[in-house]
From Swiss-Prot:
It comes from Magnetococcus marinus (strain ATCC BAA-1437 / JCM 17883 / MC-1). It is found in: Cytoplasm. It comes from the Bacteria. This is 3-hydroxyacyl-[acyl-carrier-protein] dehydratase FabZ. The lineage of its organism: Bacteria, Pseudomonadati, Pseudomonadota, Alphaproteobacteria, Magnetococcales. The gene is fabZ. Keywords: Cytoplasm, Lipid A biosynthesis, Lipid biosynthesis, Lipid metabolism, Lyase. Its EC number is 4.2.1.59.
Amino acid sequence: MSTDPISLQEIMSFLPHRYPFLLIDRIVEVEQGKRILAIKNVSFNEPHFQGHFPDHPVMPGVLILEAMAQAGALLAGYTDPDSVRGQLVYFMAIDKARFRKPVLPGHQLNIEMTLLKRRREVWRFGGKAMVDGEVACEAEVMAMTRKREESHE
């Protein structure tokens, strides 16, 4: 288990996402092959808040799910770095998604994802995103790794 701080540069070495779609700010803890704890700091300056909703900004649920999927992709990367680094990790499916609490500007989203199953390049994760100790979202997500060149076919 690693609780050493993980730099943004290292996060970016596993994830191809960049602003405004890189939704993980920090990794708090990683247990290879088991789980990851990550943080997304929610800022009013994020572009989606201009229209969702102008008088009552709420982080879109699909972006909470995307942050959870990115945390899962990072767990895959730390579990098997040789087969994930330099690959694209594609979001394949969402199951059992439930939204329990709105996520607002100023909140810190604490994301915990657990590896449920892996079969070659297909990964299944389960987890939750929490705000102030309360579950904001829970879901299972599936992802698949592919070489970057194969992704354009």
